[in-house]
Amino acid sequence: MSHPWPAGAATGLGSLPGTDPAEAVRLVLGELPELPYLPELPGRGFGADLIGRTGALLVDLPVEWQPHGWTVTSHSGRDQARARDHLNRDLDAVTEQAQGVPLLKVSVCGPMTLGAALELPNLHKVLTDHGAFRDLAGSLAEGARVLLAELGSRLPGTAVVLQVDEPGLPQVLAGQVPTPSGYGTVRALPRSVATPALTSVLEAAQPGHRVVHCCAAEVPYDLLADSGASAVSVDASLISDGQLDSIGELVEAGISLWLGVFPGTDADISASAARERIGRLWSKLG
């Protein structure tokens, strides 16, 4: 499988501190020229984080912020409009500064993680209703297509990579998502429902330009491969020896492995230490 990014390229995953989109885009373009990305700035307030930005993309599926979180509603209101305003400011910043960039990555929240975050009007998670969940996945897939098309028109000649963030996927598959009351958990989502939902979103991007990021332990590598991912991004510190065979099969199938080795916190790690961590893992893979 061919990929548009060069071997050994470094990139970021999404969120940055601060509230200025122009400054954030300048930083990313300067520090990560081989695979820059459209940053998220959750410090601007609700609607600017991963869930809010993705909610702004949903097509024909209004959502509103309620005291208990984002909820599917009958009509779009000011909360979704605010999230769209944040996204438009981000798009304007990258349009102004990224002309001529050969490659750009953009992230959306994946359908399983989004389904675990959004609630229906009856205060149950979207995951509890498979019909509503399929509607959500379809709306998200269409929204991702619209976003990629807009980036294509704003940045002619730039190839756009789609990163689908699924930090909650292992919990969803294991039936470990808490109910809104906190007294129970949501029934596990069958893989027969999860896999096509993820595939539909990934297919918004061109073949070879489809990435799934899962920063949790117990990553379902086989499901990600079956979904049509071109690359899988994981936290290197959470990889166990029991997962090495699955990772090896992934790599042998031509799927790119992206290893997160620099923490997204104030903790520091040198470039040499990061290389050593990658080298140790790669030697285990044989």
PLM feature spans:
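Conserved beta-strand positions in the central sheet of alpha/beta enzyme cores
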Residues: 36-39, 163, 232-233, 258
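Catalytic-face loop-and-helix region of soluble metabolic enzyme cores
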Residues: 230-286
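Glycine-rich tight-turn/loop motif centered on a GG-T
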Residues: 76-80, 121-138, 174-193, 230-233, ...
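Glycine-rich anion/phosphate-binding loops
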Residues: 79-95, 134-147, 272-281
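Structural motif
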Residues: 13-17, 42, 109, 213-217, ...
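Short loop/turn segments at strand-loop or loop-helix junctions that form parts
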Residues: 106-120, 162-169, 260-264
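Alpha/beta catalytic barrel-like cores
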Residues: 1-129, 223-228, 255, 284
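Active-site loop segments of alpha/beta catalytic cores
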Residues: 139, 143-245
